[in-house]
Amino acid sequence: NFHFYFGQKMTPMNNLSMQYMENNLQFSSRNYLSQNFSTTGREFGLFVESNFELGKIGVEPKLAITSGDGMNSFGENSLDADVGGFKYGGRLNIYPFGYFKKGNTYLGHDLLREEKPKILVGASSSLNMGASHKVGEGHYNEDLLNEGTFLFYDTDSIGLARFPNYLKNNLDFCLKYKGFSMLIEYVNTAAYNLQSVALNNNATVLLDTTQIS
């Protein structure tokens, strides 16, 4: 079965715990990985989700195309508009011993107490084709520079804005059994298309970094 969504929702392209709603977290705030590599986790776009079984193995694929500019990506006024390109990505969750109990997957705890050990192994990847935010979940606003937004310029076309491509890959492992819950997450990020980039519009201050990770 397939489910299609269009609008603003939790994106599947982040680490697993960023799929949890705030009221379903195990602790009072999100973990450091989520805080450093995501913002709200909500994006605007088209989302396709499915789930099926291969024998006793559960498979849950998800795909997404978003604006690449995070929540409220159309901006609050004419000076706060979308910039850069779209973000493309997806997620694949595998349940080797079958799905968790209904309603127990996207919880930080094992509130429903899985009677047998249940495991989720997940991976996600996304490519933001023109990012203007440090984690690819926001868009440039000169009033929000201290919140991670930025604007680069092309050295070959003076005054023309230039945005790097931002790649993010995640790996997740979740185990739940009789009230015990364990989550391991890994993330790797990199930025590309940073050659011939300037930090100011008259191209006198050059960016000397070719990869950020």
Name these PLM-found stretches.
Residues 93-96, 100-213:
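Detector for outer-membrane/organellar transmembrane beta-barrel domains
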Residues 60-62, 72-78, 102-104, 133-137:
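A short secondary-structure junction signal
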Residues 1-71, 79-98, 117, 125-127, ...:
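Outer membrane beta-barrel
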